[in-house]
């Protein structure tokens, strides 16, 4: 079939976020504050390497150029390097990235790079080791920082760092973050805290609009960059005096969904049209044999007709997303 995925609102989809596990070994306050709780899925229930190969092949045939491997914590999969290589078999996929807590980055960055990984996002919500421990439940700050250094040593030209913006936690630490990226080619992405089914109280207490940071950046001479078609949702800013960049992800901003270019597949093979949508379309029965590819592509394309124009976060409707590890954040 090989036609570009397009929805009823003429949005084109070049970017797949593929969750390969919902297991995580961190207990971040905004995601899994009580730690990982199995939802009836064993490690054997997650997508296999062959299933991942087939689903990414179908998306590549439908115009996908970028695949981001998410979790949970993707690197907890023992076959993670094999998964990277399987995705990389598709020549049409130009970028293969991972979002990781950095737990195994120092050990494995070079192997991931060799397998075909082209991009790394690391979650770092504070540059203070004690606060990092308090947020994540893990005393691993120095290990994660060493992992970022290892990523550069392995040949990644830029590392993206995700920081969830939280009122009275880290929103006042802009100067500290800017000093950190001034000599380093790091794109630091501040992500507005999003409400989830399990996180409503935390959201009400700590949400702050990214507009506050955007106004401050513009006042300091930071310049808004143009997005590429397979980029994520961040508004990216650069400054001539800084090697690093700042990204702002503001899902509550008007028209945030107008430029949506990404779809999600969960670790058990469900297609999700929106992080905060309802339900999901099972693809797994069509991931068992290479001969099913045409039917798989048809199911993906047909499902896209149901994609809504926007999320409904403004009405506190978080859809199926009980926490951000559920379908890969």
Curated annotation (Swiss-Prot):
Residues reported to bind [4Fe-4S] cluster 2: 257, 260, 274
GO MF term list: 4 iron, 4 sulfur cluster binding; cyclic pyranopterin monophosphate synthase activity; GTP 3',8'-cyclase activity; GTP binding; metal ion binding; S-adenosyl-L-methionine binding
Pfam families on file: Mob_synth_C (PF06463), Radical_SAM (PF04055)
Catalytic activity: GTP + AH2 + S-adenosyl-L-methionine = (8S)-3',8-cyclo-7,8-dihydroguanosine 5'-triphosphate + 5'-deoxyadenosine + L-methionine + A + H(+)
UniProt: GTP binding residues: 17, 68, 99, 160, 262-264
Binding site for [4Fe-4S] cluster 1: 24, 28, 31
Entry-linked InterPro entries: Aldolase_TIM, Elp3/MiaA/NifB-like_rSAM, MoaA, MoaA_NifB_PqqE_Fe-S-bd_CS, MoaA_twitch, MoCo_biosynth_MoaA/MoaC, rSAM
GO terms classed as biological process: Mo-molybdopterin cofactor biosynthetic process
Keyword terms, alphabetized: 4Fe-4S, GTP-binding, Iron, Iron-sulfur, Lyase, Metal-binding, Molybdenum cofactor biosynthesis, Nucleotide-binding, S-adenosyl-L-methionine
Class of this enzyme: lyase
Binding-site residues for S-adenosyl-L-methionine, renumbered to this chain: 30, 72, 123, 194
Functional pathway: Cofactor biosynthesis; molybdopterin biosynthesis
Function, in words: Catalyzes the cyclization of GTP to (8S)-3',8-cyclo-7,8-dihydroguanosine 5'-triphosphate.
Designated name of the protein: GTP 3',8-cyclase
